[in-house]
Curated annotation (Swiss-Prot):
Family annotation (SUPFAM superfamilies): Fe-only hydrogenase
Gene Ontology terms describing biological process: iron-sulfur cluster assembly
Keyword Nucleotide-binding (UniProt): no
InterPro entries with a match to the protein in the record: Cytosolic_Fe-S_CAF, Fe_hydrogenase, Fe_hydrogenase_lsu_C
Species in which this protein is naturally found: Cryptococcus neoformans var. neoformans serotype D (strain B-3501A) (Filobasidiella neoformans)
Protein name (database record): Cytosolic Fe-S cluster assembly factor NAR1
Function according to Swiss-Prot or TrEMBL: Component of the cytosolic Fe/S protein assembly machinery. Required for maturation of extramitochondrial Fe/S proteins. May play a role in the transfer of pre-assembled Fe/S clusters to target apoproteins.
Gene Ontology MF terms in the entry: 4 iron, 4 sulfur cluster binding; iron-sulfur cluster binding; metal ion binding
Binding-site residues for [4Fe-4S] cluster 1, renumbered to this chain: C22, C81, C84, C87
Residues the record lists as binding [4Fe-4S] cluster 2: C215, C270, C480, C484
Keyword terms of this UniProt record: 4Fe-4S, Iron, Iron-sulfur, Metal-binding
Family of this protein: Belongs to the NARF family.
Amino acid sequence: MAFSGALTITDLDDFLTPSQACIIPVRNNKKPAEDEGPTEIHIDSNNNYYEVSTYPSVGHDDDIGNSKKALEKAEINLNDCLACSGCITSTESLLITMQSQNEILEFIKTNPTVVDPESPCHKPRLPILSISPQTLASLSAAYATASSRPPIPLLVLLRRIRAFLSQPEKGSWRVWDTTFARHMSLRESVVEFHERKDKKEKGKAAEMPMLASACPGWVCYAEKAQGDMLPLLSAARSSQGIIGALAKSWYGHKLQHKPDEIYHVTAMPCYDKKLEASRSDFYSSLYSTRDVDCVLTTGELDLLLQELGFDPHVPIANESTPSYSATEDSPFPELLTHEGSSSGSYLQTIIHDVQRSHPNPTRIITREIRGSTDNIEYLIQDTITGQVVFKGAKVYGFRNLQNLVRKVAKETGIGRSGRGAGAGKLSAAVAARRRKAKTAAPAATSATTSAEGTDVESIASLSLVSGEDKKLDFVEVMACPGGCVNGGGQMKPTVPTPSAPEAMEVDEEGYQRPLPDDGVAVAVNGGSNNVGTGTVAGMEEGMRWSTKEWVAKVEDIYWTGLPTPPASPPLTASNVNGFAPQVKTNGTTNGQVNNGVDRNLQSDQLAEEIIHEVCGDDASKRWDFMRTRFRKVESDVLSSGGVTHEAVKW
């Protein structure tokens, strides 16, 4: 099982032998009495523990049992484990074995499909499965590779899975996708961004830049190792957090089901989502249930479907007919598209909002940091004044994430306990480079104004120079290289088994020694495998479970397999799927919306209706329904020795 790199390397090495023994001592805050003598621990027949004094009490010389006291039971739950910097790094499988396809199979066997006449008050739990679009894209790529057939469009695959799992013998599941929940998450991110921006403009202390928090691996790392930066994290719930609230709080209420009468499962691209679902903010103490009862990775969903006998290539009726409004099968519009990235499009959504609200025309200028497509800065420039009005970034992968932490710490002063000896020289060198670039700026400006047309490269160069001093406003952060389509729980490329002797590595003595590969060795689209070398053609460092070619294939299916794909996945200056005011749409045919923009407008209206039904005018309820909180983890192991997470050197 593969947790994100941000999670697995935090605060402890991975050289521990896997064990279920907890390294955190269980403390009792009750101080012992000064006159207490020696005691013993006795266990009765019911496994209750008692503390018994070994000396008779005064007035009871012959009775030792009169001082027996029942001991409080010590418990360690999953939240305690998440607050620990120990076994989670070496025994992840022990932590998440309860969330797997085996639990779903057991639920299908034990959950009654009809109400028992002898106990009519006991309702069968309503099963709901919410599938992420990244999961659908990965499954489609795997099915296409295994069968040598064209990839199955995401809408078709979603409906085939729904038709299969809705059968009574399979559990009578309601199967949704999570794109509407993502739509609500994006809307809330825009609202929160404006709140922070308004505070900053009013001269108040604002938590900027705003850092996306949809990636649980990044959140876990921030809570454990970068606690001072938690105020910068967006409080908007992720798509999983919102779909869980929708299933238990809104949909269940409409069907007159209590939250504990719904069994909600999500299928996500990474294992870290299992940890997100266990957070206390997503738990109802009133009904003793979580918003998401079980999280399956893409690979686990595939195993579940295999166990149940699913054939992805069996067609069903009306499987490719678009249906943009809510239906009996899904209370939300299916597979909404949000242009930008396959990791949620958080940055693109903010960019669209900034462009739409700015009074003058703007252009977007991008810059790859060190030539990496996983670390890109985006500048929005006013084309009239030349001012850079927004600076954002897309940061994927733990190496880039660490650089982001240092950059944000430098810009904000957050979490900077000290500076190294070479920090001053480095800052001086950067400042000198900026001054040199600025002195050359007037000549470039005059050249562009005197020539006919627009020198795009010169304008971009000038904008980058002016953007050097501009601080970041928003960052889309993901722990996995390549983003969510390359999550650790996604389907892996098929590993060819070398059978011919010439396909194996030969050592100095002539013996065949196929060395184990550190990662997945696969050739995609005609590529070649380097068997036994430990590397794969096209593999980027950090992509331990996949290759660039495989991720590109899943990415392509993600965009082309949607019912109404945008013009192109990359960021553009046009607002194709931006959020617009709540207005009635007129572009309908037979009651159905006919384009992506109108679908999102319709989704805006539905989102507002849902929020009003659940929360009314209560701002506190709305906050709890749409947002979450983050908590700095104080490690008992490190802090007890006087060492903090921030002081650990790697």
